[in-house]
C-alpha cells in the first residue's frame, strides 16, 4: 500500500479491492503508520479502488472511530460511484468524511 506524508497529514492509496482477504492488513498498515506514531490526520485515497465488501466497510468505520478517539480525523477521498452508493445505502455517508478532491480534504483536516 502506497503512503505519503503531506506535512502532518498521511495519505494512503487503497488497493483495487478492500475486502475480507486484505482489509485487516490495510487497517493495520494505516494504524502503524499514523495513529501509532501520533499522527491524527489521515486521508485514504480510493481512486484505484473498485470493490469493497462488508469487511472493508467495517474497516472504514474502525479507522474513523480510531481517529475520533485520538482527536483526529480520517477523510475518504475519490470514492467510486458504486462505493458511494453503498455508503448511502448503509447511511455511512452521513458519518464518514467523504471528499472528491485532495485540496478540499486537506482543508477539512487543517481546520
Residue ranges and their predicted role:
Residues 1-28, 46:
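STAS-typified acidic loop motif
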Residues 20-95:
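Amphipathic alpha-helical interaction surfaces in cytosolic regulatory modules
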Residues 81, 103-104:
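Acidic phosphotransfer microenvironment of two-component signaling modules
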Residues 82, 110-111:
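Short leucine-rich amphipathic alpha-helices used at interfaces
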Residues 97-101:
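Short acidic-hydrophobic, aromatic-tinged amphipathic segments that line or gate anion-handling sites
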Residues 104-110:
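Short, charged, intrinsically disordered terminal tails
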Amino acid at each position: 500500500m502506497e503512503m505519503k506524508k503531506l506535512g502532518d497529514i498521511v495519505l494512503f492509496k487503497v488497493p483495487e479491492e478492500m475486502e475480507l482477504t486484505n482489509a485487516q492488513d490495510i487497517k493495520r498498515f494505516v494504524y502503524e503508520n499514523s495513529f501509532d506514531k501520533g499522527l491524527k490526520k489521515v486521508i485514504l485515497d480510493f481512486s484505484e479502488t473498485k470493490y469493497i465488501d462488508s469487511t472493508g466497510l467495517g474497516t472504514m468505520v474502525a479507522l474513523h472511530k480510531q481517529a475520533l478517539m485520538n482527536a483526529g480525523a480520517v477523510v475518504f477521498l475519490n470514492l467510486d460511484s458504486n462505493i458511494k452508493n453503498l455508503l448511502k445505502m448503509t447511511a455511512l455517508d452521513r458519518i464518514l468524511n467523504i471528499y472528491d478532491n485532495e485540496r478540499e480534504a486537506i482543508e477539512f483536516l487543517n481546520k
